Amino acid sequence: MTYQSVKAKLQNGKTVILDGAIGTEILRREVTWADHQLRKRPDVVRAIHADYLAAGADVISTNTFQLTRRAFRQHFKDDAHMRHIGAPDLETRWADLLRAGVTLAAEARAAAGLEHPVAIAGAMTTLEWCFRPDLAPSPAEAEAEYREIAEVFADAGADLLLVETVSSVQEAVAAARAARAIGIPFWIAFVPNERGALFSGESLAMAAQSLAPLEPDVLLLNCAPPDDVRAGIEQLRPYWQKPIGAYPHIGRFNPPEWLFTDEYPPTRYLEEARAWRVQVVGGCCGTTPEHIELLAQRL
Amino acid sequence: MQPYPALRERLDRGERVVLDGPMGSELVRHGVRWADNGFRTNADQVTALHQEYLDAGADVLRTNTFQLNRRVYQNVFRDTAHMRHIGAPDLDARVPRIIGRAVEVARAARDRAGRLEVPIAGVMSPLEHCFRPDLAPSFEEALPEHTEIARLLAQAGVDFLLLESMNTVREAQAALRAAQLTGLPVWVSFVVGSDGRVLSGEPIPQLAADAMLVNCAPPEDIQGALAQAPWLSGAYPHIGRFDPPSWKFEFFPQFTCTESWPAERYAAAARAWNVQLVGGCCGITPEHIKALKS
């Protein structure tokens, strides 16, 4: 139901505000981010959701970036090795944490007592490392894995899926097919390079045409600096008539953490966002509730 | 006498030698942020842990350089151009700098403790994740990368090189060749599976190293390996369960459920291994090393 009101906003040509970064915001609050902290520091995760709700976000996303069965499995030689030397719950932890991610977002939404409806987006991304399309599993494997993630999200009460930081058409199509099979609304966000193409080398025109029959409600650009996101928007716009969204990162990736810079304070970020001329705006790594608040007030 | 030749004499006399315990899992247990092997935010705690192992009686100190190589940074970007485009400005220089720093703090801890007889082992490890032999590079790819790491460790002043958790024979051979180019003595240690073989499934080879060991596996598996390869002269298993975090893809040394191996039990097991070199891998603490020593 809450998604219907977001969709109505989109159809009426209104701007929809997405939240900002969660992972880097956890770091900025002096908590380590090797783990999603969904069980160890639920208070911090809930507080970040609350801050984005207070800032005026219409859609908040779960703190579940790259959280998959595979994320645990790939630390081991094989499943037998994981059972032999791994912690006892590693086979099911991914699903437990996805559910916890939705629960924390829902708790924050309920506690905020807002009058306008806010949708919870279950965040899922590439199954392998987001910047490495060369590692992507086969389409059949990917679709099966996306489907089990989508099922957990739908079952836990997510209103839509935000498939983010996608770096190839093949992965986007696999995720879209999984979402359609479950019957949950979905948006897809791609990582653009400096020329506004995908990391796989494919064009956004090709991505848009391949996805059109699967009917995502919004296509977005994220997980790249503002200039690259802008280049991606320009590449996508002629080929996508439905709403477009954008949420770049600001600062620098300092593996495995983030380097915060003062290059894009909220006022400059707002100027950039105005120039995008897109309907959905938010923030990726490095953005804060202050960035989102200014977008919500001025756009 | 220099630290390594003195240690070599002790080994030749048939004495038992106690290695230190792990850096990573012990630092993480104390809440250190595992970025740049802990050096990004907690260099003082790295130094302090070396000192704790010396106080516990360790005869050898290993540098905090496990799984520290250029790939750790490069693997999380599309390519080098992408790393320069969105990455922190100094990522190219990170590995040489941290390796130098790691050797420096180990030497400083030794000097401060006045234990000048303790040799410092420069730790080298697989270029990809230690539990993923399927990702191991070819000999030709691995050789130059290991050569750079060996050279950096040697130039920073380690006394010998220790190849840890090697998971395929071909990468061990490449790393051994690279390490030998420095002229320093080299020890090679393999991670083993529950069949007592190298994690890749290969039998443990007999290599031209100054000592051969096994590590990075539970005590039972280590015992299985020792039974199959009588040329092994050292062992340092992990204890507990590897508990990787939900997001980070590279090695993250968190071990839980270690209670079933208290120090006394570990020391009793180590006696039964009947090897000259004993120490501890992930999950082990200074308490365990103290128990081994006594």
Residue ranges and their predicted role:
Chain A
Residues 1-299:
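Domain-level signal for soluble alpha/beta catalytic cores
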